[in-house]
Curated annotation (Swiss-Prot):
Lineage: Archaea, Methanobacteriati, Methanobacteriota, Stenosarchaea group, Methanomicrobia
Gene Ontology cellular-component terms listed: ribonucleoprotein complex; ribosome
Native organism: Methanospirillum hungatei JF-1 (strain ATCC 27890 / DSM 864 / NBRC 100397 / JF-1)
GO biological process, one term: translation
UniProt-annotated stretches for the region Disordered: 88-112
Keyword Disulfide bond: no
Name recorded for this polypeptide: Small ribosomal subunit protein eS24
Short name of one Pfam family: Ribosomal_S24e
Keywords tagged on the record: Ribonucleoprotein, Ribosomal protein
Length: 112
């Protein structure tokens, strides 16, 4: 998986950088979690301040285009981004906690 930055804009009003990128890959389409980790390492950004907005994969091509936003602090990210974007666009703890909350408990599953 190779990521190329296509555009980078500083948005001072919202305290963030807006990044446009393209990914070339072989094999299976990379997951959002993989893209998030690689993009965070490439931009030297903390993972809790980076959110992936969108990923677009065209049928039959091994290329993805997308956009991401890097905030100056995690507080700004939480104030500005809607909750569903934060859950979908961030890898790590928030994603794991959402899965744990949605999963039925063992007692409820046994009662059925």
């Amino acid at each position: 998986m190779e990521i190329t930055i296509t555009s980078q804009t500083e948005n001072v009003l919202l305290n963030r950088k807006e990044i446009g990128f393209s990914i070339t890959f072989t094999g299976a389409t990379p997951s959002r979690k993989m893209v998030h980790a690689k993009l965070a390492a490439m931009l030297s950004a903390p993972k809790d301040q980076l959110v992936i907005g969108s990923l677009h994969n065209r049928f039959g091509l091994t290329e993805i285009t997308g956009d991401a936003r890097v905030y100056t602090s995690a507080e700004y990210l939480k104030k500005i981004e809607p909750e569903y974007i934060r859950k979908r666009g961030m890898a790590g703890e928030e994603e794991g906690n959402a899965d744990a909350q949605d999963a039925p408990s063992g007692d409820a599953a046994e009662a059925s």
